[in-house]
């Protein structure tokens, strides 16, 4: 008999990639995340953070307002003992010293800087008890990217043994190991 999680993932993938008319209320169904009157990317990031056991964020650009949008949830996670890792860069000189100082105040998040040329990643990984989820797309950790701008992001969920999450985490770890602590 198939594991309940695997069955749920199969049904979610079938709805997301084969037949949109299938009934499936699972939170594992792939989703297009956009900013409009009905939804925004920030809400999806917060929803994933609220349910995760750990998280990894890789973004080129971060603003103080973007960080402020998540500060409460980051503090809540800290009180629950949930830790995260964040990689960013000095690409195009966008990130400010004040923003870096704000990042350093987040006790449960390790922060590193990469010097990879042209670093322009936008990836969010959330480890949950039985599965992982990821948001991959065009949204940096800025208030406008998460709430206002026209952005395309995909929310995908995967079994912890899935190849996609394995490869994404490997990319993150290689980048992490070759980055410097903030």
PLM regions with names:
Residues 1-182:
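PLD/PLD-like phosphodiesterase catalytic module centered on the HKD motif
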């Amino acid at each position: 008999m198939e594991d309940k999680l695997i069955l749920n993932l199969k049904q979610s993938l079938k709805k997301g990639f084969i037949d949109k008319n299938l009934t499936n209320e699972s939170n594992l169904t792939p989703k297009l995340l956009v900013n409009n009157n009905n939804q925004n990317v920030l809400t999806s990031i917060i929803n994933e953070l609220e349910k995760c056991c750990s998280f990894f964020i890789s973004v080129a650009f971060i603003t103080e307002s973007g960080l402020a949008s998540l500060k409460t949830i980051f503090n809540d996670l800290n009180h629950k003992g949930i830790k995260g890792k964040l990689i960013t860069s000095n690409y195009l000189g966008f990130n400010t010293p004040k923003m870096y100082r704000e990042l350093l105040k987040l006790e449960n998040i390790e922060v590193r800087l990469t010097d990879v040329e042209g670093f322009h990643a936008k990836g969010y990984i959330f480890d949950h008890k039985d599965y992982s989820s990821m948001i991959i797309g065009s949204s940096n950790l800025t208030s406008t990217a998460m709430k206002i701008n026209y952005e395309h992001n995909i929310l995908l969920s995967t079994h912890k043994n899935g190849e996609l999450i394995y490869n994404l985490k490997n990319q993150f770890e290689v980048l992490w190991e070759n980055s410097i602590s903030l």
